[in-house]
Amino acid sequence: MSRVVLLLVCILGLCERVSAQDWPAFRGADGRGVADHPALKLNWGADENISWRQEIPGRGWSSPIVIAGRVILTTVTRDEGEPEAAKPGLYFGGNRLKPPTVVHHWNVMCLELETGDVVWQKTLHEGVPLTPRHIKNSYASETPVTDGKHVYVLFGDVGCYCLTLDGRLVWEKKLPPCRTRFGWGTAASPVLHEDRLYLISDNDEASYLLAVDKLTGDEVWRVDRDEKSNWATPYIWKNKLRTEIITPGTRKVRSYDLDGKLLYEFGGCSSITIALPYEAHGLLFVSSGYVGDTKKPLFALKPGASGDISLADDETSNEHIVWCQKR
């Protein structure tokens, strides 16, 4: 099975004209998901406003990143057979409690931005998967991140890897496989800030937030989390008062400082948290929602909170939560 990477004319034009506007991480620079440029197209499709297309072997739901005229992406291939196809639409019953029994290969690929030609490909791990996946998930769902000199690749229940832009492995850090809700697998992407890489693993066994040195892969600190399986990528909130690591969770949304100290927390999210928070107009927006839940809230926070700032059942705001849509 292969997937197709399509490059929009608007993205190619953006990176050609403004090198500072590479797409270095999940949802772009600072995780805001915003590409503000006059070259952006309103319409695109398989044959419209596309510069090139490239068949990619295997399966991977990670987003490509763009840096220095290169496109970096991850994918996982298998020695034989095809992964079970994900059915379209909303449905239940996609859980798979046992992993495949054939050898898989966890890969990172680099393509030329202007042409889509493969520049290099590297296999970072191979073996039989130790954990299952929902048929809508993949073994390569975490988006890489780059600081412009190195690329950091995470496969959630295999390991984290640092490579140079030409594909040379600098370090690797093995990560233990963990049981996730109904065997759905992992998806939270790594986050880079200054000299540290932040990795989160919310699972049904031993959840944690981990900071590692980006140059060596050595652990800087680790905090245990009273959480079960979540899939939300952490968000680095650089507000007017301080820099925080925001981690959405089913039990609590938590904020940590850059040394792993808990700053504040609040409850009220739905039973599944996936969405990345974002900042706009000086406020932080945190959301969660699941089709099976009656509550699908959206919170707006202002900087400076401490302690437990959870809303009471009859509240939609307090000193630090500016407003909440409980729907």
Locations of regions flagged by a protein language model:
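N-terminal secretory signal peptides that target proteins for export/translocation
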Residues: 1-2
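Bacterial N-terminal signal peptides
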Residues: 5-15
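Noncatalytic, solvent-exposed loop/strand surfaces
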Residues: 16-327
